[in-house]
Amino acid sequence: MDIAVWIVSGLLAVAYLAAGLMKTFIAKEKLVKNLPWTEDYSAGTVRFIGIAELLGAIGLIAPWLTGIAPILTPLAAVGLVIVQALAIRTHIRRHEQVIANIVLLVLALFVAATRFLQLAGTI
C-alpha cells in the first residue's frame, strides 16, 4: 500500500506543480486561451488557486518524506480535494468536462485517507 500511495502522491504532486506554476506565474490574459474558466475569476483569485496548488504539491511529498510534521501530508491532500470539488462546481456551471477533476479528487482522497490511516497506525 505504501508504494501505491507514494506513486499516486508523486503523480499528483507533478500535476499540481505544473498547474500551480502556470496559474501563479502566467498572466491571466494568456491563461484564458487554454483555461477558459479563468475568465470568470480575477487575476488574484487565479493566482491564489495556483499558490494553493503549489503548496498542496509540496505538502503531498515533503512532510511525509522528511518526517517533519507528517500530519501536513494528509491535510494537503484534503486541501486538494477541496480545490477539485470547487473546480468541479465551476466546470459544471460552465457546462465543461469534469472527468479529469473527478479523477484528481479521487486520487487526492485516496492519499488523504491512506496517510491518515498510516498516522493512526491502522495500516
Task: Give names to the regions the model predicted.
Residues M1-I123:
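Membrane-interface extramembranous regions
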